[in-house]
Amino acid sequence: MAINLYKTSTPSTRNGAVDSQVKSNPRNNLIYGQHHCGKGRNARGIITVRHRGGGHKRLYRKIDFRRNAKDIYGRIVTIEYDPNRNAYICLIHYGDGEKRYILHPRGAIIGDTIVSGTEVPIKMGNALPLTDMPLGTAIHNIEITLGKGGQLARAAGAVAKLIAKEGKSATLKLPSGEVRLISKNCSATVGQVGNVGVNQKSLGRAGSKCWLGKRPVVRGVVMNPVDHPHGGGEGRAPIGRKKPVTPWGYPALGRRTRKRKKYSETLILRRRSK
């Protein structure tokens, strides 16, 4: 991804660093509208997730996470911007006439061919089961449950690594540093998700953040006691507690929130690093 820096005519352009423009002209049969999606409110209009709201209207693009068009070659026709994720997407024209969107693999260009199946080449963008991949392969869009579609390593720049295969399971090292077991029959896509430099962007102004549907974040220490446990005091005061807490009084910043009896607890060999 190319980062554009503009001449300093206004404060917003002086501090901004945005990616090069990738146009989006989605196909009508691969999109649908969403009503109040991502606004952080429930059915009664009550805020359930803070710091969300507003933003530009979006159309959801149907992404093929399953990659179940087996042994049918497809060609990358366009690389488009998707407002619902930080990764780009590709429009694929398959040999049987079907058209689908997939996540854009890093390095893929218009005109490249991809295929999914059991005995396909280990090539960027191809999807195949983990049992057919050599050790050390970089992968993304990884299935957890067979046939459900990819659920792991789907963000921009995400990449996992196949480090071992034993019995019915394969050992993966995920982008978070977690090492876990997954069935060897689950499929994944070879390569890394594109738009790697997304974390180098700087929006430059608050208005650009509002367009994305992100509301301002206010520190609890500057609130009143009625609004946050950290609030109150004369002037710039400390939080008045040994450890920070959430707005509802629960421990924050370091408290483990994962359920101990979750079914996948035995599949995680090493916990993710913070």
Curated annotation (Swiss-Prot):
It holds the Pfam family Ribosomal_L2. One of its GO terms (cellular component) is mitochondrial large ribosomal subunit. PROSITE patterns: RIBOSOMAL_L2. One of its GO terms (biological process) is mitochondrial translation. It comes from the Eukaryota. InterPro entries: NA-bd_OB-fold, Rib_uL2_dom2, Ribosomal_uL2, Ribosomal_uL2_bac/org-type, Ribosomal_uL2_C, Ribosomal_uL2_CS, Ribosomal_uL2_dom3, Ribosomal_uL2_RNA-bd_dom. Residues 1-22, 225-274 are annotated as: Disordered. Keywords: Chloroplast, Plastid, Ribonucleoprotein, Ribosomal protein. GO terms for molecular function: rRNA binding; structural constituent of ribosome; transferase activity. Residues 1-15 have a biased composition (Polar residues). It is found in: Plastid, Chloroplast. Its main location: plastid. Part of the 50S ribosomal subunit. PANTHER family: LARGE RIBOSOMAL SUBUNIT PROTEIN UL2M, RIBOSOMAL PROTEIN L2. Belongs to the universal ribosomal protein uL2 family. This is Large ribosomal subunit protein uL2cz/uL2cy. It comes from Lobularia maritima (Sweet alyssum). The lineage of its organism: Eukaryota, Viridiplantae, Streptophyta, Embryophyta, Tracheophyta.
